[in-house]
Amino acid sequence: LEREELELWLKNHNNYELFKGYVKINFLIDLDMDMFDVDDSKKQLLELIDKEKKEYRLRKYVNVFKYAAVVIIFLGIGYLYQLGCFTKTPEVIIPSDSITLKLENGNVEVLSEDGTSQILDANGSVVGSQKGKQLVYDNDNVMEKLVYNTLTVPYGKRFEVKLSDGTKVYLNAGTSLKYPVKFIGGNKRQVFLTGEAFFDVAHDVTHPFIVNMENLNVEVLGTEFNVSAYSEDLTTDVVLIKGSVNLYTNGKTLNEGLRIEPGIKGALNRKLGSITSEAVDTSIYTSWMEGDLVFRNMSFENIVKKLERYYNMKIIIVNKQLNNEIFNATFKDEPPIQDVLNSFGKSYGISHTIKDNAIFIN
């Protein structure tokens, strides 16, 4: 009887339009409206009524909307299946040699070295842009809280980022930098570094700039300096080019730290927790920015670490006696690794073999 009442009720044009509008209004997936078939929905509805057996009878308008609601549910579930909402989304595997940018919402974007793109915040607003090997963040965005991005550069590559305050940071291979999308007035300008980077800090007397590392912090007002803080190294080195910086370890205050001047390298011994300083040729520590490899009084073990990062290749020292041997060498203009290895072979009699994408030093 319910079926007969519904069919009779739907024959009226106004009732039919009312039924159709009810389903569409309550069907929350607007994108599906182009595929919505009212006649098919009516057929499903009538079939459902035929299967249902009731001992009591409700008012006809209540039944109409009750069944319409059931159709809505069926349509919604079917649409969600079409979208894949009930299937497991395949995990996207990012190649290990990719330059990546982790956004505030946890999403990770892959940056092409010759690409151009916009950087968006969680609200879809543009906060910066990429042009080739450089990210540039805007300073005219309105933000009430600190929001961070993390730029990660793999072995074998280098990249640059210009922060919202105008500070320029050059990231060496195997480096990660976490920084605010925009620095907010009243707060210190803080970034977090692992690896190696050169900082050209925009001067701001009222907002000190702090580079936080695992065991060491560097605080400046505006200056140029290089920081090397690779986890596999025994020391964290800060080489000052211009201005002045203060170094202090975690748990210490700024006044308990060490102040260094241009031409000085401050080094934290991670095992001892002590900071020492010495005069150095600063060009040795910034040569990587030009693609050069410069080794001065460096152990072969540390040279190999730099070569692995520079070329993104696994290098195994078979002859362990070489580890502590000291070498001096200079290689200009992004030299091929074969040239570097041949030079060591010619000058020092060190041979090598290549097998399974690894270099063995004999």
Task: Write out the residue ranges for each language-model feature.
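A residue-level detector for the "anchor" residue at the start of short, highly conserved motifs
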Residues: 49-67, 76-362
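N-terminal amphipathic alpha-helical interaction or autoinhibitory segments
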Residues: 1-24
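Short, solvent-exposed alpha-helical surface patches in well-structured domains
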Residues: 5-8, 18, 44, 55-56, ...
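Positively biased amphipathic helices and basic secretion/translocation or surface-docking motifs
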Residues: 28-64
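Residues that form generic nucleotide/phosphate-binding pockets
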Residues: 9, 22, 44, 48, ...
